[in-house]
Amino acid sequence: MPSSSSRPRLQLLEPNLEILPAYAEALGRGWSPNNVEDVSAAQLAEIGRDPTEFITELLRQGGTFRLPDGTLVPKLPDRLRWMWDGELVGHIGLRWQPGTDALPAHVLGHIGYAVVPWKRRRGYATEGLRLMLIEARRVGLRRVEITTDRLNIASCRVIEANRGRLVEEFVAPRFGPDVRLRYCIDLVEQGHDATEEERS
């Protein structure tokens, strides 16, 4: 595993046309930014039709989206970022309800992420989550929930490395029968740990 000093610095970048080819290449290699369903083929088709519109739709606020069970629900405010180290590392997103730390029942957590297979086991997910927690504080959240599959030990370690504490095991029928873990990260307790990125 490369040391943190030798590894290129991770950035969270807003999706844009300049790095879209790297994103499309990852999709073409079978990676999906969605952990619940494989959207790689659908997104590749959208990029092929109109790359600019694809980026616009990714970043569009408001509107609705369809859950895996077909239910149409309002889209929450969100921040979508691509993890980048000179190459595409993966996807990470933050969603929230203004004025509250609570989430609707159909939203599994505030933050979701997916690292491309060839960049895993390098600490990128841990660092990406740390950077996104800074964004969560900036939008006023005092605590965030993150969920993961019970068998996803790597994801559990990523969350726990960012001070996540296990709250419960649960099943979300809309998203399948698998048992999931719900973690909570208290951001207020981390306020004294503000980094240079957060102060800038």
How should each PLM-predicted stretch be described?
Residues A136-T148:
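Conserved GNAT acetyl-CoA-binding A-motif
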Residues G112-V115, R121-R138, C156-A161:
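Conserved acetyl-CoA-binding loop-helix of GNAT-fold acetyltransferases
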Residues E18, I153-A154:
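Short alpha-helical
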Residues M1-H110, P117, E135, R174-S200:
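GNAT-family acyltransferases
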